[in-house]
Amino acid sequence: EYIEDGTITRIESSGVRGKIGEAISQGKLKGLAIMRSHGGRVRAIESGETQIDIAFIGTPTCDEYGNCRGIGGKSDCGVLSYAMADAYHADKVVAITDTLVQFPNFPAHISMTKVDYVVVVDEIGNPQKIATGAAKPTTDMRKLMMADYCTQFVVNSPYFKDGFSYQTGVGGASIASTISLAKIMKERNIRMRFGVGGLTKPMCDLLINDQVDVLLDTQDFDLAAVESVKNLRHFRISAGEYANPFNKGAVVNKLDFVILAALEVDVNFNCNVVVGSDGMLTGAQGGHPDTAAGAKCAIVIAPLLQGRIPAICTDVTT
């Protein structure tokens, strides 16, 4: 509605879905729609290329001075990593919470020094709906088989050794591959040095079972990951620390493995994660390009067909 009436004329995001994606794809947006990776977005903000006039940041808890945390309230999301760049560089910052707590709300994920206003509302969201769609573990036999193939590739590569590092996407097969990998790690007595995420329960289970030294977290995709934030070896990192290609050190460049999903993969190994075969914007690239560029071994899990549409093709849609 706001795109069609001209209220919104430009969009910068890591991806869009649903009616917004349809509106952009149909040419209803008057200006540009720029799709950036997680690292690309924070680079644009920190470099000044993207100027934010005002940032509205949903935070599960906040004190009256503006110290924000992703836990401790009724709508916990875990960490606030992707909002940190906005808070640090926007001209004005508004923290929106449904749980106002006593000062000081420490350790703060976003500091009071960056927040101009605190607004209290009845509800900022429903944490029960955090794990939906792609972020749910799969029970599909085909995807479980794909996950097993992926795991076999990982464990037979030269990078699978004590102290390796690892990240998966949130596709069902990617999540399942972590479960099967954990079993082989236990059998071979191999320990992971660090796991990176977007995190889900299987990765957090590695921490609980003492199969990984530390987790580095930018986003939590289920309630188990949200709860895991309380673990002293579960560290939050900013989007800049995670994947900004222009800073002096990004975590993605220290990855051994990254397991990703895709809408399409072509015969030249190009991947499309944003646009459907019908030309509609229907997904988000997130950290896909960042991790694929940084990791020693990037693995993309995709079926031959997505429904009735070929996922393996001569040329990707985009």
Predicted regions and their residues:
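Conserved alpha/beta enzyme-core scaffold
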Residues: 1-318
